[in-house]
Amino acid sequence: MRKIRTKICGITTLEDAAAAAAAGADAVGLVFFQGSSRAVDIARAKKITAALPPFVSVVALFVNESAQNIRRILAEVPIHIIQFHGDEDDAFCRQFDRPYIKAIRVQTASDIRNAADRFPDAQALLFDAYHPSEYGGTGHRFDWTLLAEYSGKPWVLAGGLTPENVGEAVRITGAEAVDVSGGVEASKGKKDPAKVAAFIATANRLSR
């Protein structure tokens, strides 16, 4: 049986974390990038993680953050996985004694093809839509057919996913993990519990 893993990213409140966990999310994402409307500080992140049930992974998202600040956050917040969304290289990403996921902003097939060689120590790659000035969470999607034949390092599909299109996305790409933020929001930084539940329910149906 294939299990489609789900991550709800951009969690900013206890209520949204609880809704994601209750719906069956495998992971929640906390954004530590102050340029994002979904950013959280250490105090809020600690409250959110303390309220999560066991076996829900916590992913910390960073964008071109300093190593010093990353270490400070990791020392105070129980983070299971780090997700790098900026211009970090493999040497930078692997230094924090945590598994890491590297986001790849996809423009062409070569971005996908070369990613594993560029980030050999990544636990997984996250393929997201390219935007010239934003580092994810844009609501844009890329050409999913570029992933149809990909068989490299484990990977996560992101970029413009919604409860309505995640089924199609998984069927086209063969994704075994999906990541959503804006597609399940009521407004920037605030999740819609019904959309969260619908997104995860669709992924679960595809897991058969």
Curated annotation (Swiss-Prot):
Keywords: Amino-acid biosynthesis, Aromatic amino acid biosynthesis, Isomerase, Tryptophan biosynthesis. It is an enzyme of class 5 (isomerase). Pfam families: PRAI. The keyword Isomerase applies. One of its GO terms (biological process) is L-tryptophan biosynthetic process. Its EC number is 5.3.1.24. GO terms for molecular function: phosphoribosylanthranilate isomerase activity. It catalyses: N-(5-phospho-beta-D-ribosyl)anthranilate = 1-(2-carboxyphenylamino)-1-deoxy-D-ribulose 5-phosphate. InterPro entries: Aldolase_TIM, PRAI_dom, RibuloseP-bd_barrel, TrpF_fam. Pathway: Amino-acid biosynthesis; L-tryptophan biosynthesis; L-tryptophan from chorismate: step 3/5. Belongs to the TrpF family. This is N-(5'-phosphoribosyl)anthranilate isomerase. It comes from Neisseria meningitidis serogroup C (strain 053442). The gene is trpF.
